[in-house]
Structure formats: C-alpha cells, structure tokens
C-alpha cells in the first residue's frame, strides 16, 4: 500500500507504519511532504492508495476529480510560535510582541504548497481584525522559506524550526502546536501558545482511493491504535472544539 502524507505527520505515521508491519504483516510505503505539492502529484496522475492531508481543501479537490474516493477527518492541530529562548529578552514579551518586532526574522511555510502557510495567512487575518495594520505588516515581513517547490530542504529527522534557527535562516517560526512534543528535548527552544481567539484550526483529512485503504483507515488509524500515536505526538481528535 502506498501513502502520501503531510510532513507534519511523519512521527505518528512512522509509528503506525511500524505497527502495521510488526503486528499485521502489512507492507506500507509512506512518503512525506507538503500536502499541497503531494496533491498536485496525484492530480497529475500519480497512483496512491491513501493521501493524508493537513487540511480538508486538498482532499475535497481530489474528490471533485475522483468521485469514488472517500474522505475521513482524523485529527486536528493548531498553530504556535516557535523561537529561541535567547530571543526573549524581556519578561513582558509575548507571542504578538515577538511577531511584531522589526528586529526578528519570521519564517513561515509556503501558502498553497503547504497548508501550514495557508493557516498562517488566516492567522494574520485574525490578527488584523483585532489590531489594525498588524496583519498586513506580518504578511510583508513573513519569509516563506519552507514547504514550497523550491524551498530549503530540511534534513530528514530534524525539526523544521530548530534547524532553521541553527542555520540562522530565521529567529521566529510559525508552525503546528504538535511541535511541542518533538521540541521538548531542545532546552534552547521556546514554544509559545497562540490564544484561541487568534488561532486557526487545522483539519487533517484522509482521502482513501481504494477499498483496502478505507478498510485500513476504519479498522486502525481512526480507532484506538492509530489515535494513540496521534495523541502521543501532540495531535488533537477530529471532533475537538
């Protein structure tokens, strides 16, 4: 079985893949990448059994083209602001003051190619509604440096934000809140929550192209086994409000 999955799913899906091989003797090949770029490959004719997207937009666009596929929401996520602890120089600094600092470089994912980039633009719009002029300044300031067809390639196994900071590409990065889990081991990294009134809900959705893939989803990923991997890696349930 062949699966294309959003890069943010690498940790839980790798655990799921290992369980499928060890417990069920199922051979599963998973390739990770920005969901928008993966969707383009499917639209161009690439064969796949299952597509796991970080949004519901790409699966719906595929269903419009291939009406037989089944869509299954399976997890949600939120955005957060990631930075180096050394960047926070004053106790009264919060996520918004850091974002608006003219001295700090803000890295983001590439919109359209990577859903995280689209969610980031939605975050900027939410900020603009509450602080006139802030959102437009952030759109000008943000550097789309990952997730695009010609973007920087993050080494496999490295956290995106941590690697960007290490290589001096950015001082701040807007990523998924599930990063909390993988960044705990980095004592020099700080993850700041974004309040609900500003934040954006990321709706992770599966597109099953074959009956076998749908059975696999129904029997494993969306029940206790697969959901435990998702929860352990910082994802929220599909019905989370």
From Swiss-Prot:
Pfam families: SBP_bac_11 (PF13531)
GO biological process annotation, one example: molybdate ion transport
Top-level taxon of origin: Bacteria
Xref: PANTHER family: MOLYBDATE-BINDING PERIPLASMIC PROTEIN, SULFATE-BINDING PROTEIN
SUPFAM superfamilies: Periplasmic binding protein-like II (SSF53850)
Lineage: Bacteria, Pseudomonadati, Pseudomonadota, Gammaproteobacteria, Pasteurellales
GO molecular function: molybdate ion binding
Protein name, UniProt field: Uncharacterized protein PM1146
